[in-house]
Amino acid sequence: MIKRNLNDLLSFVAVAREGTFTRAAAQLGVTQSALSQSISGLEARLQIRLLTRTTRSVSPTAAGERLLNAIGNRFDEIEAELDELSALRDKPSGTVRITCGDHIQRTLLLPRLTPLLLEYPDIKVEFDINYGFRDIVADRFDAGVRLGDTIDKDMIAVPIGPPVRMAVVAAPAYFAAHPKPRSPRDLVDHNCINMRMQSGGGLYAWDFQRKDRHVNVRVDGQLIFNTSPNIVDAALAGLGIAWLPEEEFAPHIEEGRLLRVLENWCPLFPGYYLYYPNRRQPSPAFSLVVDALRYTRPRGTTIGGG
């Protein structure tokens, strides 16, 4: 009886968190029908409905939410303990989940982790591409990647890249039809390409600094994206002015396909950091990932210059 209840409770947690029987069944490695029977059996024994089912999704009822809050974290703790036990084997193993943007994943994380993954075949890395401010604890990520000045103070932050500079660019065709902005405030008169935060839903404000002067501009335009490659493509097509870390525009600036403006309003600032909660016993796999990504600034350099 106890074993059956534990299996059914695990099934319930998976469905409640995933929001669909399809994803939950795939996660648990069972059929959807078996999963549905498990949930129905649990509800029958408890004599209370735990899930509300629609044609598109599944969500916990008030009773289901209460049960999920009571047991969900306990299953996570059990899984974490089992992962630590598996780490006692000769080779580090386990899955490391990281949330980050797609550009930094393609250009920095994957190249740095490639030698590690080839050397340790039992280590898995799962990337969640997201530009929002994810709660890595609530969403059960091992770590996230953000620019250094946006990380909460209670997190451990490990530098994984050099200081960065933002860039304001547009295609030559755009500037042929519109005057170049001379100050950040001029951007309000331009067609700017916006990015929407995936977590909060708001638009990113464009932030500028010149010596001790800070300017924060809420721009407007015809296009809004939630990933940076789309913004680069739109700028190349002449559809407006874009604002991103300069490395995302670098090859196009060098080739003359994008022109840069307001350069003296875009100083260097702390670059990308891997951040994670202060944990007592990181797994060997996670420690290896952190070491592989860690950036060491060349001696004699500072954020303000080389």
From Swiss-Prot:
Alphabetized Pfam families for the sequence: HTH_1, LysR_substrate
GO MF annotation terms: DNA-binding transcription factor activity; sequence-specific DNA binding
Domain HTH lysR-type, chain residue ranges per copy: 1-61
Keyword field: DNA-binding, Transcription, Transcription regulation
Biological processes, Gene Ontology terms: DNA-templated transcription
Domain of life (superkingdom): Bacteria
Database matches in InterPro entries: LysR_subst-bd, Tscrpt_reg_HTH_LysR, WH-like_DNA-bd_sf, WH_DNA-bd_sf
DNA-binding region(s) from the entry: 21-40
CDD domains in UniProt: PBP2_CrgA_like_5
Record-stated family: Belongs to the LysR transcriptional regulatory family.
Annotated function: May have a role in the regulation of oprD expression.
Protein name per Swiss-Prot or TrEMBL: Putative transcriptional regulator
Organism of provenance: Pseudomonas aeruginosa (strain ATCC 15692 / DSM 22644 / CIP 104116 / JCM 14847 / LMG 12228 / 1C / PRS 101 / PAO1)
Lineage: Bacteria, Pseudomonadati, Pseudomonadota, Gammaproteobacteria, Pseudomonadales
